[in-house]
Design a protein with these regions (language model features):
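Hydrolase active-site cap/lid region
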Residues: 209-273
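Serine-hydrolase catalytic core
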Residues: 34-35, 244-408
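A short beta-to-alpha transition loop/helix N-cap that caps and shapes the active-site region
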Residues: 80-84, 224-232, 341
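Short, surface-exposed "cap/lid" segments of acyl-processing enzymes
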Residues: 26-135
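A domain-start/cap signature at the N-terminus of enzymes
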Residues: 1-39, 408
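Alpha/beta-hydrolase active-site loop
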Residues: 93-184
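Alpha/beta-hydrolase fold nucleophile elbow
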Residues: 186-198
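Glycine-rich nucleophile elbow surrounding the catalytic serine of serine-hydrolase chemistry
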Residues: 196-206
Length: 408
């Protein structure tokens, strides 16, 4: 019989920015209690997964029904970064910060549009009127019918969350693992597999970096080996994270709420090269430490040579480094249409058209066979990475996994 459970736990605070977290972590579990469970599988969800929670549940339940595994979905810190049209509790809200208001009124001026007033709290009303104004310009052939005016806005995740990028998300996964093994002690001796696509793929490999003793296999589909700055300090770089076509005539450049900034070096929220370095997967000294902590990690990645985000070369460098350090690392670099099988790999674009479900469906049988008969245990450990004048120590402390963050 299929067992589905949902748990809420305390996880971690933002140690880098010294911010106390106010929300609990939610994670969901599925397994068939009539099967002998042979592995723990964590689907590391990617950006935008929150738009349809039923898809997440379907994928998790599918794997639990079709394989002898317990499957977990973790709704990590700042997981809800896009609007969810049916479930408000998992939906980011569109908002307008001061810079968005400035940008919008500048666009009004560029198009010679005079809003009813200059009240920034009525920006939605102004935009509706502006859209109608642009429709009239198109009707008079003053404006090209396919053209759109560009404005900006920001996604506010629920629960007062914000984009931390990588660290809190990864720690949440490990705390979910530790909590799960307290509830189900029999799971402690199972191999632990992590995997997902895009940001979810990055998270799987990042978890292998900050807690290698908890990763027996990490599966990645098209994750970036380097932090994506658009997601962290995109506002300051004028690089939106997402784009939305709204109504007939507007194009929204979208950012996600964050505490980080790239302009004020004296700010406690300045995103420094040290903060970047810890989130990078390509630091040679860090890779050496990771490999020494767990020489048995299995690392598997799929990546398009033609990925439109230009991340393929970095992934090649990363997997060559893994191999040179003696890790069991396999990169499937998809180079041309002959490698498109239509079952798993459907195109040469970012993420290859391959879902999380397909990624595990493809790799799980061989991994379960490799793990058959081996003994695994849930041990406690720690690892420290030096990044300039900062030291990041990721460690087990009591029943939690946490970050100790200190200046050298």
């Amino acid at each position: 019989m299929l067992v589905n459970e949902t748990f809420f736990i305390n996880s971690c605070d933002d140690e880098e920015l010294d911010i106390k977290r106010t929300s609990n972590l939610e994670y969901r579990l599925s397994f068939d209690d009539e099967k002998e469970i042979k592995a723990l599988v964590f689907i590391t969800l990617g950006t935008g997964s929150n738009t349809n929670i039923s898809f997440i549940d379907f994928d998790r339940e599918y794997l639990a029904k079709n394989f002898p595994v317990a499957v977990v979905s973790v709704f990590y810190h700042c997981f809800c970064v896009r609007p969810n049209p049916t479930e408000e509790r998992y939906s980011a809200k569109v908002n307008y910060e001061n810079q968005d208001v400035i940008n919008t009124f500048k666009t009004f001026k560029d198009f010679h549009f005079n809003p009813a007033n200059s009240n920034p709290y009525e920006i939605n009303r102004h935009l509706i009127d502006f859209n109608a104004y642009l429709s009239k310009l198109k009707q008079k052939s003053i404006m090209d019918k396919e053209a759109r005016a560009v404005v900006s806005a920001i996604f506010y995740p629920p629960n007062d969350e914000y984009q931390n990028y990588g660290i809190m998300s990864a720690i949440d996964h490990i705390n979910a693992l530790k909590d799960l093994c307290k509830r189900y002690p029999k799971f402690k001796t199972l191999p632990k597999l992590w995997g997902g696509g895009s940001y979810g793929g990055y998270l799987a490999l990042f978890i292998a970096k900050i807690a290698p003793w908890y990763v027996d296999a990490a599966l990645d589909n098209s994750g970036s080996a380097l932090p994506v700055l658009d997601y962290i300090i995109g506002r300051d770089l004028n690089k939106p994270e997402a784009y939305i076509k709204q109504w007939d005539n507007l194009w929204f450049n979208m950012f996600v709420k964050t505490k980080w900034n790239a302009k004020d070096e004296n700010s406690p929220y300045f995103f420094s090269k040290e903060h970047y370095k810890i989130r990078s997967l390509l630091v040679s000294t860090h890779l050496e430490l990771q490999a020494k902590k767990n020489e048995e990690q299995i690392l598997i990645s799929y990546h398009s040579k033609h990925d439109e985000f230009g991340t393929a070369k970095d992934k090649e460098i990363l997997f060559n480094a893994y191999k040179e350090l003696g890790l069991d690392a396999t990169l499937h670099l998809i180079k041309d249409e002959k490698e498109i099988d239509k079952r798993y790999i459907k195109n040469l674009k970012h993420s290859l058209g391959m879902s999380d479900r397909a990624l595990f469906r493809k790799e799980l049988p061989a991994l379960l066979e490799r793990f058959e008969g081996k003994k695994f245990r849930l041990k406690k450990d720690s690892i420290s990475y030096i990044c300039g004048n900062l030291t990041y120590t990721f460690k087990d402390k009591g029943d939690k996994f946490k970050l100790d963050f200190t200046e050298v």
